[in-house]
């Protein structure tokens, strides 16, 4: 790590600042209720949602070939057909997809203590939101949780030539804020993108948010720091700056 003070912090969005996984689970529960009450599905409702969850986790999205709405509606259509058999039911798939999506967005909120932390941090350093993913999906989340006003800049991977962990997107972020990689800290919950990307770009430090106490694989990227909550960040940044003061 360099001997300059931290001048900028890059934050991941999903499962770092907002509980995307929890919001997604709530969306799935609403779909299960719909399938059971309106369409009289029984255990098939949960099986369908489990199948969709697997499809989402393996999703490969190419914006030049299709739109995210079509792709994700197809996940539901395939899951329903795989579970129930018979002809494809696009109309039901659309109903499930839009209920899941709207419920999910309703529950994507910035907690009050996270808002307070960002507000205080921004008095000391520049803040940038750096999120991977499809442009439409991520912009809808950003609008739903009303987080844009807490940042000096917002960068969505799906709008750039490359996403995390490519160094180029980190250099782009540095240029936006007028800082050097050695001035910046990356904070995120995903070792393979947030942490590896920060390491690839030569950032001052990487901070892994490990809410569930996961033991990483030996082959995983090694973060400079690990915390269980993003709310631990202000104290950690102070400690990083103290090390700089003692070294200079």
Curated annotation (Swiss-Prot):
Pathway linked to the protein: Amino-sugar metabolism; N-acetylneuraminate biosynthesis
Cofactors named for this entry: Mg(2+)
Residues binding phosphate, per UniProt: 13-14, 131-132, 164
Entry-linked InterPro entries: HAD-like_hydrolase, HAD-like_sf, HAD-SF_hydro_IA, HAD-SF_hydro_IA_CTE7, HAD_sf
Annotated EC: 3.1.3.29
Gene Ontology biological-process entries: CMP-N-acetylneuraminate biosynthetic process; glycosylation; N-acetylglucosamine biosynthetic process; N-acetylneuraminate biosynthetic process
GO MF annotation list: N-acylneuraminate-9-phosphatase activity
GO annotations of cellular component type: cytosol
Regulation: Inhibited by calcium. Inhibited by vanadate, sodium orthovanadate and phosphonate.
Residues binding Mg(2+): 12, 14, 189
Record has DNA-binding as a keyword: no
PANTHER family for this protein: N-ACYLNEURAMINATE-9-PHOSPHATASE
Assigned protein family: Belongs to the HAD-like hydrolase superfamily. NANP family.
Functional summary from the UniProt entry: Catalyzes the dephosphorylation of N-acylneuraminate 9-phosphate (Neu5Ac-9-P) to N-acetylneuraminic acid (Neu5Ac or sialic acid). Can also use N-glycoloylneuraminate 9-phosphate as substrate.
Identification of the protein by name: N-acylneuraminate-9-phosphatase
Gene name in the database record: NANP
């Amino acid at each position: 790590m360099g001997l300059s003070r931290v001048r900028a912090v890059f934050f991941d969005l999903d499962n770092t600042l907002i509980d995307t996984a929890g919001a997604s689970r709530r969306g799935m529960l609403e779909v299960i209720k719909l399938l059971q009450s309106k369409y009289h599905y029984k255990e098939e409702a949960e099986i369908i949602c489990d199948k969709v969850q697997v499809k989402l986790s393996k999703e490969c999205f190419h914006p030049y070939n299709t739109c995210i709405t079509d792709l994700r509606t197809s996940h539901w259509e395939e899951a329903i057909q795989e579970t129930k058999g018979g002809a494809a039911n696009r109309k039901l798939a659309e109903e499930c997809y839009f209920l899941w999506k709207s419920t999910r967005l309703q529950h994507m909120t910035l907690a009050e203590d996270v808002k307070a932390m960002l507000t205080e941090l921004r008095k000391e350093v520049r803040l940038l939101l750096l999120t991977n993913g499809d442009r439409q999906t991520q912009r809808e989340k950003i609008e739903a949780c009303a987080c844009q006003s807490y940042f000096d800049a917002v960068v969505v991977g799906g709008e750039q030539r490359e996403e995390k962990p490519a160094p180029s997107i980190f250099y782009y972020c540095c240029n936006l804020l007028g800082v050097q990689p050695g001035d910046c800290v990356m904070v995120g919950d995903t070792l393979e993108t947030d942490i590896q990307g920060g390491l690839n770009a030569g950032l001052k430090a990487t901070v892994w948010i490990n809410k569930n106490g996961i033991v990483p694989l030996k082959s995983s990227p090694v973060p400079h720091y690990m915390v269980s909550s993003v709310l631990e960040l202000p104290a950690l940044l102070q400690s990083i700056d103290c090390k700089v003061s003692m070294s200079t």
